[in-house]
């Protein structure tokens, strides 16, 4: 372990000695005027696109009391890709699973009968 530590210290010393001294970089100076644009007021909040026309976007509504975190910038509906299935969908799913299990069982029986010798 001492050999590894000594090798590491020697390598760092050698690397530091081989690098020429450079003057420190000049200090950062803040710009005289702000470089950004202020946000437009709420009624003229636009969504930008590659097309030359602009479409106004609706403003966000106030969040309800039990909500947490950010309410989001716009009030568009969020698509739900996975929802809770209704009772009919669950019954169809169970029927399909049952039919698949029955077909698999019948295939197994058919192969067992074909394999028997009389």
Swiss-Prot record:
InterPro entries reported for this sequence: Vitelline_membr_Cys-rich-dom
Main subcellular location of this protein, as a coarse class: secreted
Keywords: Secreted, Signal
Subcellular location: Secreted
GO terms, molecular function: structural constituent of vitelline membrane
Domain of life: Eukaryota
Signal peptide per UniProt: 1-17
Domain VM: 36-75
Function in brief: Major early eggshell protein.
Similarity remark: Belongs to the vitelline membrane family.
Protein's recorded name: Vitelline membrane protein Vm32E
Organism: Drosophila mauritiana (Fruit fly)
């Amino acid at each position: 372990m001492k050999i590894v530590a000594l090798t590491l210290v020697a390598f760092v010393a050698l690397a530091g000695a081989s690098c020429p001294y450079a003057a420190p970089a000049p200090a950062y100076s803040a710009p005289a005027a702000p470089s950004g644009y202020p946000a437009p007021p709420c009624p003229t909040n636009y969504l930008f696109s590659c097309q030359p026309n602009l479409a106004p976007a609706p403003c966000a509504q106030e969040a309800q009391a039990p909500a947490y975190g950010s309410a989001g910038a716009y009030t568009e509906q969020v698509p739900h890709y996975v929802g809770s299935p209704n009772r009919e969908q669950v019954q169809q799913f169970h029927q399909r699973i049952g039919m698949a299990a029955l077909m698999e069982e019948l295939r197994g029986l058919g192969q067992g009968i074909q394999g028997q010798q009389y």
